[in-house]
Amino acid sequence: MSWRGNCVKIFLENSHDVREGRKDENNMKDEYVAYVGTYTHGSSIGIHLYDVNVEEGTLTERKVIPVNNSSHIARSLNGKYLYSIADEGVAVFAVEDDGDLTPINKVDIDGMRGCYLSVDKTGRYLFVAGYHDGKVTVVHTHKDGRLGSLMDGVFHKGLGSVAERNFRPHVSCVVPTPDNKYVCAVDNGIDQIKMYKLNTQRDRLKLVDILRCERESGPREIVFSESGKYAYVIYELMNKVDVFSYRDTGNGPEFEKLQSISTTSANVDQAHDAASGMCLSPDHHYLFTSTAGDNTVAMFHIDPETGCLEKKFALPISGEYPKDIAMFPDGKHIAVANHESNTITTFTVDYEKNVLVQKGRPMKVETPNCILITKK
């Protein structure tokens, strides 16, 4: 697995579809909702459901669906179901026509509370990342929406830098590669991304390679480009994004490092800042990140030829600890879940002036962990 290589930055003309505000007609005809997962130690009781006004870039709270400590949520591949962390297990809900949620069942994951969910490209398997116990769990899913038995569970081993928090495994993200050939398990504690092969015949995860990150970098999340050729890794402790090329060699995954770029504004305190959220714009022309402490959202233009990033801005978001971010489907607005100020803020993204324009007052919601904006 390679870390060599430099990126030649050839920044092409930005997409007129986004820059000139041209809306996708299909997106504008569809109706959308937002789900916000919260901790339930205080007054919140679960997943907050919002109606989304795409044109205005606003959210209107409708109701709260009870579920304990919804630290992360994910939609099924066919869109019919919503998965949520639920204490030491995972709950699944049927998504009704109006976006409301009806409980189906819940399974225990034989470990501590998870922090991240994703599904494979067939929709047959649900992946759970375990931050507290350093575990990767795979759960069978059924066609009727029910969660089935645990397929496999792997505990990471090893030590990090043996300094404060990152001294043992903390799996913070588990996602399949775009070709569905491998499973990437990002370990925030031991500064590694472990690559597994999913053996569906034996119901086992097999470790095939390890991407070793910088010591004390704290990799938090990985996302892939629409083409599947590039991967973006955000680092919680170094407040940066690394760009990698990705391909399957036939003998295993190959990642080649192309670029590193900061997520923060000019005046930062590395000791108290923590890069946290990351998402792509709907047209995949831009990458957005959020950084706690600095309390900013950054926007990067993605070069379509090289996958490399050009930072356009890193601006304050009128909240504390922007733990997660989500783009509206028109690409013109962004929502920020501010975990410690107990708010959600929404902004219009001005691609011409490279600024964020806040939409109204922050909305109160206790300890928001994650936000998902999706079609009803």
What kind of region is each of these model predictions?
Residues 39, 87, 131, 141, ...:
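Short loop/turn segments immediately following the C-termini of beta-strands
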Residues 43, 67-77, 110-121, 157-178, ...:
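Beta-rich, blade/repeat-based domains predominating
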Residues 51-56, 93-99, 139-148, 197-203, ...:
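Short loop/turn segments immediately following beta-strands, especially the blade-tip
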Residues 60-65, 102-108, 158-164, 206-212, ...:
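A short beta-strand motif characteristic of beta-propeller blades
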Residues 61-123:
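Blade-loop segments of beta-propeller domains
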Residues 103-172:
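Asp-box/WD-like beta-propeller blade repeats and closely related beta-sheet repeat scaffolds
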Residues 184-239:
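Loop-centered beta-sheet repeat module
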